[in-house]
């Protein structure tokens, strides 16, 4: 891998880290959306939630995600690998299901149980170079997790009813 590609991959990781921080730590929608390419897709695959444009993603973050983040949400990176077009990151997500989570478990009432789930995100980037400077923006952010295992730990069936 050339030095230029290594630097590009490092910048992509920085953009992804900034997006994660903007959403889950700072809860700053505008900072998160500023890191997205146009067009962009954000999809939580098992839940079928997310958006297909900056406007949809902004609405999704403002209405479904930020007001519904668990108080004790933790996100710990397990592994990350990248090439010049995408980053694949494996994270352990922990939380107490203390409120409805329409972005993660649509239609499921709070169970007040603690859970951890391993999530894998595949994040693609679009790069633009102008006057010798390359900027990278997220063009696709897809996250998958063991939905059945998570629901089992929380004591709910696929239809949202209790086990």
What are these regions (language model features)?
Residues 1-163:
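C-terminal and inter-domain tail/linker signature
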């Amino acid at each position: 891998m050339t030095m230029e590609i290594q630097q590009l991959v490092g910048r992509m990781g920085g953009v992804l880290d900034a997006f994660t921080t903007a959403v889950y730590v700072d809860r700053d929608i505008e900072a998160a959306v500023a890191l997205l390419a146009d067009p962009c897709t954000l999809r939580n695959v098992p839940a079928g939630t997310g958006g297909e444009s900056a406007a949809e993603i902004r609405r999704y973050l403002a209405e479904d995600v930020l007001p519904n983040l668990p108080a004790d949400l933790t996100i710990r990176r397990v592994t990350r690998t990248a090439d010049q077009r995408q980053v694949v990151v494996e994270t352990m997500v922990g939380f107490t299901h203390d409120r409805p989570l329409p972005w993660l478990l649509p239609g499921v009432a709070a169970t007040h149980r603690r859970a951890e789930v391993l999530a894998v995100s595949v994040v693609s980037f679009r790069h633009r170079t102008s006057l010798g400077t390359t900027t990278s923006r997220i063009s696709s952010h897809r996250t998958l997790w063991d939905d059945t295992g998570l629901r089992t730990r929380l004591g709910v069936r696929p239809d949202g009813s209790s086990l």
